[in-house]
Amino acid sequence: MVKISLILPLLVLLTLSLTLAPCSCIAQAISKTADGFDLPVAPPMGAGFYKSRGFRSGGHLGEDWVTDGGSAKGFRQPVHAIGNGIVVLARDIHVAWGNVVIIRHAWIENRQIHFADSLYAHLDKINVREGQQVGKGQQLGTIGTNHGMYPPHLHFEIHKDLGIGVNHAAGTRDLRSYWLPTDFVLARRHLAGGGRNVPTPAANFLLPTTEHPWYLGRFWHSPKKSTHPKSSKSSASHRSSSTSQKHSSSNKWKVNRYTDP
């Protein structure tokens, strides 16, 4: 009789293979190097927004941005590219993500070319297409709720590992694979060598095809009033409103069985 301990890993691998599909989103392309980076809401420095939830290794691998005075006021507010780059993903991923845009950036630092992906999730609308060149500050879409799953906010990540896409299991869940988003921007507000044409690596991501077990296992939870803990002020000294104001519309926006990625 085959031991259960041997069967379970095989079942997990089979399930993963059935619920993830490769996406050759764009081939290698030429894009312009960044001349600096801004925050993705109310650029350059996010005036009128605050960071309601920050990065935590092994947990929340990005930042959540909402408007001062309550998340409802941020619904359908513009979301902007943090810097020059090329759109490598722009589609509705469903599950815990909803509408997602990922931009691949190149920049010159210490005389070397570096690359990173910026991710913008839960959008209400997407205004760009895959393969499109974008400039710093260009509108990518609008703040949304992931089809009513969350209170309105922008989930924002920056990836060192260009293979992650929307599959957090593709990299280490810590600063080996991710940048602290606000710190990344503040350290690179102005860069030399912007506007140069450089070859950008192709984007080959694994995307969920149905309801990936990564969401249904680790992130399953019972419905709560809000998926967001108490806010913390960002290093950019963004204003924060009182606890009573944060996500004041949580009764209006349905909070589903998923937590924010």
Report residues per predicted region.
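Positively charged n-region of N-terminal signal peptides that target proteins for export
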Residues: 1-6
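Small beta-barrel nucleic-acid-binding modules, principally OB-folds
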Residues: 59-72, 116-118, 122, 163-172
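Short, flexible loop/turn elements at secondary-structure junctions
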Residues: 43, 55, 69, 107, ...
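Bacterial N-terminal signal peptides
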Residues: 8-21
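Surface-exposed, glycine-biased beta-strand/turn segments
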Residues: 23-99, 136, 145, 180-225, ...
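Long, low-complexity, intrinsically disordered segments
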Residues: 234-261
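Zn2+-dependent peptidoglycan hydrolase active-site motif and core
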Residues: 74-76, 82-127, 152-157
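Conserved, short, structured surface segments that act as functional micro-motifs
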Residues: 101-105, 132-205
